[in-house]
Design a protein with these regions (language model features):
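Generic structural motif
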Residues: 15-22, 27-31, 52, 100, ...
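Helix N-cap / beta->alpha transition motif
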Residues: 27-28, 96-101, 147-148, 187
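Extended, solvent-exposed, turn-rich assembly/linker loops in the middle of proteins
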Residues: 61-131, 136-138
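Solvent-exposed loop and beta-edge segments used for protein-protein assembly and interaction
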Residues: 16-18, 89, 169
């Protein structure tokens, strides 16, 4: 028979279902003068929506309960953050940092990476302890987030929809692109907040 009983628990949390929307408009004359106007507008709207999703994901990572304070960015700071996760396998980890911290991180790692051709040529950080370092403006200065993709989940509630409207008198074309979703921290054990100077 069974020797142990496996139990599962969860903490209920309420989340807001949000609409992420991009909007742009152009006039027929603009599209005639430059056929890329529509493509650029659609691309800009899509990027706006992605940036909003990214900002929400960072807000959710901020709720993580595991923390790894560090005096400064260093190889040791990353090692300590990885240790907080207590993982058997470190596959799938990534580290998000701010562009404001990128220079300090490069300087701190210069002795560890000085023989890496990419670092010597471009200042490329790449990976630290096998963890890819991703620089994003969505992360505030002096903070970092070590995580796996399982930490935050995007629950799509409504597929992408596109609406358009055109005023025939002014030849003004309007586009709205939207997606309805919930962005939530779904596994707090898969994320560590790194506080620099704290």
């Amino acid at each position: 028979g069974n020797q142990t009983e496996i139990t599962v628990s969860f903490t209920p949390a309420e989340y807001d279902v949000l609409t992420y929307q991009g909007y742009f408009h152009y006039f027929d004359e603009q599209a005639m003068a430059d056929p890329m106007v529509v493509d650029a507008g659609l691309d800009g709207s899509a990027k706006t929506m992605v940036n909003k999703f990214t900002a929400r994901a960072i807000e959710e990572l901020e709720k993580a309960t595991l923390t790894a304070p560090a005096a400064a960015w260093s190889f040791d700071a990353v090692v300590d953050a990885i240790a907080k996760m207590n993982l058997e396998s470190e596959d799938g980890l990534f580290l998000l940092i701010s562009p404001a911290d990128q220079a300090a991180f490069r300087k701190a790692l210069k002795d560890d990476l000085k023989y890496s051709e990419g670092f010597v040529r471009t200042g490329y950080i790449g990976s630290v302890c096998g963890v890819p370092v991703i620089v994003t403006k969505a992360v505030p200065a002096n903070k970092g987030y070590l995580a796996t993709k399982d930490a935050v989940t995007v629950f799509i509630k409504k597929a992408t929809e596109v609406e358009q409207d055109r005023d025939p008198n002014t030849r003004d074309n309007k586009f709205w692109i939207r997606k309805v979703a919930v962005v939530a921290l779904t596994d707090a054990t898969k994320a560590v907040k790194i506080h620099i100077g704290g």
